[in-house]
Design a protein with these regions (language model features):
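Cytosolic juxtamembrane N-terminal segment immediately preceding the first transmembrane helix
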Residues: 1-45, 61, 269-274
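Extracytoplasmic
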Residues: 33-63, 142, 146-147, 177-178, ...
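C-terminal ends and interior cores of transmembrane alpha-helices
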Residues: 46, 107-122, 354-367, 450
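Extracytoplasmic gate region of multi-pass secondary transporters
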Residues: 52-56, 177-186, 268-324
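Central cavity-lining transmembrane alpha-helices of secondary-active solute carriers
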Residues: 72-92, 320-333
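Conserved MFS/SLC helix-loop-helix module at the cytosolic interface between two early adjacent transmembrane helices
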Residues: 83-126
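Intracellular juxtamembrane helix-capping segments at the cytosolic ends
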Residues: 140-155, 383-398
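Glycine-rich segments within core transmembrane alpha-helices of 12-TM secondary carriers
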Residues: 158-195, 202, 206, 405-418
Length: 516
């Protein structure tokens, strides 16, 4: 049996930072590691996420399968977040650190892409679902390690800014994905064909008709994933050299919680208490939130084809525009949280989520150019939700922070549920009215930022983490200093009164003694 502890120990000995004392990471020290991690790690899983929706649509058309079977591909990907975070990413971070976990995640992601090419070459839906599961294992391991690394690599008060900037690079990966699919996957002879108008619903087009299965159309998928897997494997080697043979990426200490033995009485576990209500609320909100984001992305192309009468190629371009708005949304939120005393992160998150609810509801009954514009606005407003929920839900839990981070990554598995429900709704009430499901779910997500602004204990914990304890305590310090000044002035006033009374008594006594 392989002794993983000894394997990790040997890997750590190759690290130039091995057995060296850790230094305090200041704000300017985080620029290089966060920038490079964003480019090499966050961008890569953003690319994988963006390709998931585009490629799944192509596989659905090529194999002639319905929405329910196509949803299984996404379910295979997102269901992997549960074992990926609990059995791979979480233990790796605790045992070996963030950098080894990120390197391992890249390796698993490369392996999953190679499996995808094998499944496509055999025209096997089950094989491609299994490959999506392996890809999900790799991406969940990356997210379990890279997100906390961005949050914890530097002063806590800048955590929201760091993770928003890093996650913006994941958004850039999703922008690049449709262009890659257009260039290497879509058939140029059919991708420019516009759907037929719907005679019963003016301004809309008919649902894309089911085409005859033709596995020969998967040839480009085979080549694409094979090449992508090779590129990711090469990137893994390059990143490993940067991680372990340079001092550019400081190893961030992972706090370890004390073991808790509560037997079968799980309700006595410390996590099951009012102190951790915020993380549980955040997990539930993010579970629903990822379902909304995945559903919107998966049905975006069909939404464009039906309500904007766009061809496959133009629908992919519109998706690129929407993903660009997604990136702009994250950069906009990052710009706002650079001024936390004015734009507190909890305010920013609440405003963006309110915009997501409003625009999704507005897009339920519009067509043509308006449908395109509103869909793009939805992507803009939903952009900062995951990184900001992740950062705020895991703040100020000290030794329980790694466990809370694992819980947040597990919540991404919500992306496996809502798309299946959306597929059934589309079959029943058409895609326009089915968006009410997503709007309602965004409203559920909105309750989390509302709670962080309305519940006093949530507000205090987040302000202490995001603005700094000295800023939160500043009011108390001023009050204490004011009380001290007040008491001092009162004492001085009393002394002056006593002195005046004593002086007058002495003067009256002297006057009385001189009177005959």
């Amino acid at each position: 049996m392989v002794n993983f502890s000894s394997v990790f120990e040997r890997i750590k000995r190759l690290d130039v930072q091995y057995n060296k004392p850790t230094k305090e990471i200041r704000g300017r020290d985080t620029i290089l590691p966060i920038t490079l991690t964003s480019i090499f790690i966050f961008f890569m899983w953003g690319l994988a996420y963006g390709l998931l929706d585009i490629m799944n649509y192509h596989v659905k058309v090529a194999m002639g399968i319905g929405r329910q079977k196509a949803a299984i591909l996404a379910a295979g990907y997102y269901s992997a977040y549960i074992p990926g975070a609990l059995l791979i990413g979480g233990p790796l971070v605790k045992k070996a650190g963030y950098r080894i976990a990120m390197t391992t995640g890249l390796g698993v992601l490369a392996l999953g892409n190679e499996f995808m090419s094998i499944g496509a070459s055999r025209c096997s839906l089950a094989g491609m679902v299994a490959a999506h599961f392996v890809i999900g294992l790799g991406v969940s391991t990356l997210e379990r390690s890279a997100n906390p690394y961005a949050v914890n690599c530097g002063p806590r008060r800048q955590a929201a800014l760091r993770i928003l900037m890093a996650q913006a690079w994941a958004g850039i990966g999703t922008v690049v994905a449709p262009f890659l699919a257009n260039a290497f996957v879509f058939d140029p002879d059919t991708s420019t064909a516009r759907p037929d108008p719907d005679p019963l619903h003016p301004g809309r087009c008919q649902m894309p008709t089911m085409k005859t299965a033709s596995c020969s159309n998967l040839g480009t998928v085979i080549t694409f994933y094979r090449a992508l897997g090779a590129c990711i494997f090469a990137l893994m080697i390059f990143v490993a050299v940067l991680f372990f043979r340079t001092n550019w990426f400081p190893e961030v200490e992972v706090p370890i919680s004390a073991p808790v033995d509560c037997g079968w009485k799980k309700w006595k576990h410390p996590l099951v208490s009012r102190r951790f209500a915020r993380i549980w609320w955040g997990v539930a909100a993010n579970f629903v939130n990822l379902g909304c984001q995945v559903t919107f992305a998966q049905f975006f192309i069909e939404h464009m084809k039906v309500n904007a009468c766009a061809s496959d190629r133009w629908a992919a371009y519109y998706m690129s525009l929407a993903q660009t708005a997604f990136v702009i949304g994250r950069f906009a939120a990052a710009g706002l949280v650079t001024m936390p005393r004015i734009f507190k992160p909890r305010y920013v998150l609440m405003c963006f989520m309110a915009g997501a609810v409003a625009t999704t509801a507005a897009g339920t009954d519009i067509t043509a150019t308006a449908a395109i514009a509103v869909a793009i606005m939805v992507m803009f407003f939903e952009a900062p939700s995951f990184p900001m929920i992740f950062e705020s839900a895991t703040a100020s839990f000290e030794e329980w922070t790694p466990t809370c981070e694992t819980m947040m990554i597990v919540s991404i598995s919500g992306g496996a549920l809502q798309p299946a429900l959306m597929g059934q709704l589309v079959e029943s009430v058409r895609i326009s009215h089915a968006w009410w499901l997503t709007a309602s779910c965004f409203l559920i997500v909105f309750t989390y930022p509302a709670a962080t602004n309305l519940i006093p204990s949530f507000r205090r914990a987040l302000d202490k983490a995001e603005i700094g304890p000295e800023a939160v305590d500043h009011g108390g310090a001023d009050e204490e200093n004011g009380l001290q000044r007040s008491s001092t002035s009162k004492e001085n006033f009393a002394v002056r009164i006593v002195e005046k009374v004593t002086f007058r008594r002495k003067k009256s006594d002297e006057t009385g003694s001189t009177t005959p």
